Amino acid sequence: MSGGHQLQLAALWPWLLMATLQAGFGRTGLVLAAAVESERSAEQKAIIRVIPLKMDPTGKLNLTLEGVFAGVAEITPAEGKLMQSHPLYLCNASDDDNLEPGFISIVKLESPRRAPRPCLSLASKARMAGERGASAVLFDITEDRAAAEQLQQPLGLTWPVVLIWGNDAEKLMEFVYKNQKAHVRIELKEPPAWPDYDVWILMTVVGTIFVIILASVLRIRCRPRHSRPDPLQQRTAWAISQLATRRYQASCRQARGEWPDSGSSCSSAPVCAICLEEFSEGQELRVISCLHEFHRNCVDPWLHQHRTCPLCMFNITEGDSFSQSLGPSRSYQEPGRRLHLIRQHPGHAHYHLPAAYLLGPSRSAVARPPRPGPFLPSQEPGMGPRHHRFPRAAHPRAPGEQQRLAGAQHPYAQGWGLSHLQSTSQHPAACPVPLRRARPPDSSGSGESYCTERSGYLADGPASDSSSGPCHGSSSDSVVNCTDISLQGVHGSSSTFCSSLSSDFDPLVYCSPKGDPQRVDMQPSVTSRPRSLDSVVPTGETQVSSHVHYHRHRHHHYKKRFQWHGRKPGPETGVPQSRPPIPRTQPQPEPPSPDQQVTRSNSAAPSGRLSNPQCPRALPEPAPGPVDASSICPSTSSLFNLQKSSLSARHPQRKRRGGPSEPTPGSRPQDATVHPACQIFPHYTPSVAYPWSPEAHPLICGPPGLDKRLLPETPGPCYSNSQPVWLCLTPRQPLEPHPPGEGPSEWSSDTAEGRPCPYPHCQVLSAQPGSEEELEELCEQAV
């Protein structure tokens, strides 16, 4: 028998007991109650007190007997002197005896066998005794019990008739036989307040109620715990009922479209992570709050037992503690987004976000606060909020809007040289890919497929990615060599994570359009795949490095390309051997537009000097057109000399070989103050295109060697305070101490040997003092 049936019987057995008692004792109890009630009404007990006339101080001779009043006479108390009467004495009416009235007569009845024919009835004898002066009549019916029935018929006698038998009758007769005189008093016995049968009935009722209450308490206490409703289970069931469900439709998935960068996932349907079966048409799926989908029949038992997502351990009842601990790294998982787990690459989860997230206003800087980075030299305390790099949007912008965004987002990219413009125009055409979304800034991009070119740079780091070919999806982002501190310092990030060639968020990445390499004013196409700057393969002609490597690799040696012309540093030259410390917080000028740079370089190269080197002038805005980028390289040598000095100041941990190196003239504040030549402040209008990607702006910071006195502080007639400033200092003559009032005789942008240098960042002044080792050291540090 099961436990439930046993509990039901245990609860019902008190009621069954009461029904059995009523069935067994119902009729008998009713009859007994009726008989007792009739007896109570028919027989009234009497208390007979016998007090001897002889005084007994101890009181042992006093008798208290109990009898029953007969119905033949009235029930009244009486008292008198005790006197015995024979039964035959009451048969005749003689007047011989003159008895005093007020006595109590006791009559002992004999057995009916001894007197089969009595002379008078008992009722007649009781009348006769009363007529003779008895105040009460006592009948001893010990030998004739049937006499009680004869005395029940009422005759209306006024004196009481009491029946006595048993032990009480023997005690009274013994007192009589001793001829002792006594005074007898007959009293009515009061009925008890609670008769015996009433007490038993009450005890039965009370006991039954107590048993019922005890059984109920035991049933409640002994109830199995599994039958009790668990609050946690109820909450879990409610949470599961609130989860969304849907019918899987493969056609809808194809209609929504696979994104261009998820081509690896279009060959198979999503998979249930529990049963490892693909979703088929019409299957009912359960969508958990963490946006993971499973078969409803597979995940519901798991949720009832564990209350967490099988993949990300998201708790459906208490919230996502795990996702909250990740903080901003999971901020892009908004409600309503779907995540697809692609099983073609085991161990890599591919998250595809809808385009609404990438194109919506949630990409603003307010939604995700920028992470603090190292303090760059181009920023001063109190100059306003720092601008951080934003990821590219998926939709093309107008040329003016892109230029304004680039100028607003990258105010610290003011040390950008024209060599970058030249190298941008000389890049081979980038491999075009379809329009795609940009990822959030904190996503690693593992498993993404891009069209890249084979890298021409083979680093000696432990994780150099030199095997990425066309349309190769690299997943080795987490093992890229990130040990160089300079890589982190230049980019402005304190993170130790670097992207590989397959990541479009590589800090050294920019986009080159497909087309004529001579067009420097072309807008970067949003359909072009961003490629790493170290993936340039020289084809046919000398390629200019597309970016500046700041690392410790010792395999880039540009030996014997330049010769020093001048004297080595020493005390006889009068040139100071150490430069004053340069503050890292001085403001930097913004990069000019490419067309203005080309115009300035073309106009400055034939003349060799400026007409008014002491007055800054603003260049007019030229019309965009094809310009030979190779003509820009010679005019930017002084700018990269300034960059070299800033780079050597940026890496003080590297050892210097030989004696202390001579600082470049561009880094001396006193020389720059004496020769403030060629100060050009081009107009920066939105109509001029920006030839480089905004992502590469923070790579090269402005030269910290420029003195702040060269920069305009108040608006003047030649420039506006809101316009960027470009400075170039290119002395042709050796920089030697000049007499007072005498300055350099000539300024030019040519190199020492009269030929343009294919490495702009290694161009030096024509008469720069120093040795070949120092030149190699500077070139090596620049690389």
Swiss-Prot record:
Expressed in fetal kidney, fetal lung, in colon cancer tissues, hepatocellular carcinomas and lung adenocarcinomas. Overexpressed in colorectal cancer cell lines. GO terms for molecular function: frizzled binding; ubiquitin protein ligase activity; ubiquitin-protein transferase activity; zinc ion binding. Keywords: Cell membrane, Developmental protein, Disulfide bond, Endoplasmic reticulum, Glycoprotein, Membrane, Metal-binding, Nucleus, Signal, Transferase, Transmembrane, Transmembrane helix, Ubl conjugation, Ubl conjugation pathway, Wnt signaling pathway, Zinc, Zinc-finger. Residues 598-614, 632-648 have a biased composition (Polar residues). Pathway: Protein modification; protein ubiquitination. InterPro entries: RNF43_Znf_RING, Znf_RING, Znf_RING/FYVE/PHD, ZNRF-3_ecto, ZNRF3_Arkadia_E3_ligases. The keyword Transferase applies. Residues 385-395, 548-568 have a biased composition (Basic residues). It catalyses: S-ubiquitinyl-[E2 ubiquitin-conjugating enzyme]-L-cysteine + [acceptor protein]-L-lysine = [E2 ubiquitin-conjugating enzyme]-L-cysteine + N(6)-ubiquitinyl-[acceptor protein]-L-lysine. Residues 1-23 form the signal peptide. Residues 578-594 have a biased composition (Pro residues). Residues 219-783 are cytoplasmic. The chain crosses the membrane at residues 198-218. Its EC number is 2.3.2.27. One of its GO terms (biological process) is stem cell proliferation. Residues 24-197 are extracellular. It is found in: Cell membrane; Endoplasmic reticulum membrane; Nucleus envelope. Disulfide bonds join C91-C119. It is linked to Sessile serrated polyposis cancer syndrome: A rare disease characterized by multiple and/or large serrated polyps developing in the colon, and an increased personal and familial risk of colorectal cancer. Acts as a cytotoxic T-lymphocyte tumor antigen, suggesting that it may be used as a target for cancer immunotherapy. This is E3 ubiquitin-protein ligase RNF43.
